């Protein structure tokens, strides 16, 4: 589903901002996630200790270009990550606005085109814009990672109709909700809408109990995925009785 990898878990977990390496390890194990995202800047800042922790976790690593604002920065960071982690995967972020952390669509497409041509398997952090999604696919990406809301905001799925349209438009493309998820119920809703996976970081890292929150998200994501597969009933404007009339007792008016 994700290029050459078919995960059992639909939960991708970020590794930044945890109170301690021990709590990160507990949360990652509790999440049952098979894929964790890692910032090259974090790796560079903590060196061997963090690398040892990643080895202990024994999960597939998805390096990212967090903090990059230009094509050159993103491409350079991606090449460094490939050499360091020995992977073709790269979560491509090219930030266009410092306050909203919204991706720069023009730089994102250009960087994606360069990296795909260089043999990378690109996971692009994007918005729900359909044209931008088309351009990223044309550039060589085989999946898309639309945001639910701005990074770290916890707002959930801020543009539900836009995300529904994206899911409908890209029927056969893996879509991973990336950013803005704040609660397990929001993650479950995204899965019920037909998205393929959820990537989140802050909602677990900043929880009072990250390990327990990771468990909650894992359960919610699984529940949403199963509910979608089981077939959700259609919403109705009016009530529909669930109890059949057949078999009800019949009384004669004379008895009253």
Curated annotation (Swiss-Prot):
Highest rank taxon of the organism: Bacteria
Binding-site residues, 1-deoxy-D-xylulose 5-phosphate: 152, 179-180, 201-202
CDD domains for the chain: ThiG (cd04728)
EC number: 2.8.1.10
Catalysed conversion reaction: [ThiS sulfur-carrier protein]-C-terminal-Gly-aminoethanethioate + 2-iminoacetate + 1-deoxy-D-xylulose 5-phosphate = [ThiS sulfur-carrier protein]-C-terminal Gly-Gly + 2-[(2R,5Z)-2-carboxy-4-methylthiazol-5(2H)-ylidene]ethyl phosphate + 2 H2O + H(+)
KW Cytoplasm (keyword) present: yes
CC annotations in GO: cytoplasm
Protein's GO biological process: thiamine diphosphate biosynthetic process
Active site positions: 91 (schiff-base intermediate with dxp)
Pathway: Cofactor biosynthesis; thiamine diphosphate biosynthesis
GO molecular function annotations of the record: thiazole synthase activity
Major localization class: cytoplasm
Compartments where found: Cytoplasm
Annotated SUPFAM superfamilies: ThiG-like
Subunit note: Homotetramer. Forms heterodimers with either ThiH or ThiS.
Role this protein plays: Catalyzes the rearrangement of 1-deoxy-D-xylulose 5-phosphate (DXP) to produce the thiazole phosphate moiety of thiamine. Sulfur is provided by the thiocarboxylate moiety of the carrier protein ThiS. In vitro, sulfur can be provided by H(2)S.
Family membership noted in the UniProt record: Belongs to the ThiG family.
Entry protein name: Thiazole synthase
Gene: thiG
